[in-house]
A protein has these predicted regions:
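Short, low-complexity, Pro/Ser/Thr/Gly-rich segments in the mature regions of secreted, periplasmic
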Residues: 123-134
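Short, surface-exposed coil-to-beta transition loops
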Residues: 43-48, 93, 120-124
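Short, solvent-exposed loop/hinge segments that bridge or flank secondary-structure elements
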Residues: 36-54
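Mature extracytoplasmic domains of secretory-pathway proteins
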Residues: 52-96
């Protein structure tokens, strides 16, 4: 795994290196478990969610239609996570951490603290139990 901790905007391109591997593998259908780390309510929102992706779209979260899941719009496909990373890096966070999967290139762990002077605006995602389904 690649661990990257940085606060420099010039490192943004390096932080998306996992994307090159991910994109080259052309993975469109997969399952994963995703957690969101934030100061969010209700508590259920931050619990691990089993996500099924087909054609790069979330088709189920914990076996249900995504729209039946609390905060469903905050759960992301791998491609959406890469877009999220790029957006957050462009906003120049004070601290961030990203770990990429060596085999597939997707982000396994990402965490952003945009301002150390503001409480409760940090956000993180963890991806595990990744499995290609097609």
């Amino acid at each position: 795994m690649l661990l990257s901790i940085s606060c420099s905007k010039s490192d943004n391109i390096d932080q998306l290196k996992g994307f090159e591997l991910w994109e080259s593998l052309n993975i469109n259908d997969y399952n994963m478990t995703q957690t969101i780390s934030c100061f969010c309510f209700p508590y259920e929102f931050t619990q691990p969610k089993d996500i099924e992706v087909e054609n790069n779209l979330i088709i189920s979260i914990d076996g249900k239609n995504p729209t039946e899941t609390i905060g469903y719009s905050s759960f992301m496909t791998i491609n959406e996570l890469f877009d999220f990373i790029e957006s957050k890096l462009n906003d120049q966070p004070e601290f961030y951490e990203i770990e990429y999967n060596e085999e597939y290139g997707y982000p396994e762990i990402l965490y952003f603290d945009m301002s150390k002077m503001i409480a409760d605006e940090e956000i993180g995602y963890n991806i595990f139990n990744f499995k290609i389904t097609n």
